[in-house]
């Protein structure tokens, strides 16, 4: 009885599990959206999808024109953000 409970390989798990119809591959094919979203959720989901697409292109895309900003540019950008958000510089980074 314990032998059938503790399966050793994913193939055995797929065959013997009652959840085999909902394997990882099958669940990945399901859409990640809710069926009935209100306007706020649709707006937030659209923002999430656009940010995810942008992140994927930044991480995996090949852009030969991209030049990493220098330390001075990054420091200036951080100082401008701190001033814009009206936060004191706490010195913790």
UniProtKB/Swiss-Prot annotation:
Q: What induces this one? A: Induced under aerobic conditions and by mild heat stress.
Q: Biased composition, Basic and acidic residues: where in the chain?
A: 35-93
Segments for region (Disordered): 30-93
The terms describing its cellular component in GO are: mitochondrion
Segment annotated as transit peptide? 1-25
Where does the record say this protein resides? Answer: Mitochondrion
Its principal location?
mitochondrion
Question: Which superkingdom does the taxonomy of this entry point to?
Answer: Eukaryota
Q: Which UniProt keywords apply?
A: Mitochondrion, Transit peptide
What else is noted? Present with 937 molecules/cell in log phase SD medium.
Q: What is this protein called?
A: Protein FMP16, mitochondrial
Q: Which gene encodes it?
A: FMP16
């Amino acid at each position: 009885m314990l032998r059938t409970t503790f399966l050793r390989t994913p193939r055995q798990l797929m065959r013997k599990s009652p959840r085999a119809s909902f394997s990882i591959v099958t669940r990945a094919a399901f859409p990640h959206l809710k069926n009935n979203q209100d306007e706020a959720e649709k707006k937030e989901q659209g923002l999430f999808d656009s940010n995810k697409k942008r992140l994927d292109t930044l991480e995996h895309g090949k852009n030969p024109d991209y030049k990493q900003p220098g330390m001075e540019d990054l420091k200036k950008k951080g100082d401008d953000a701190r001033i814009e958000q009206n936060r004191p510089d706490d010195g913790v980074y």
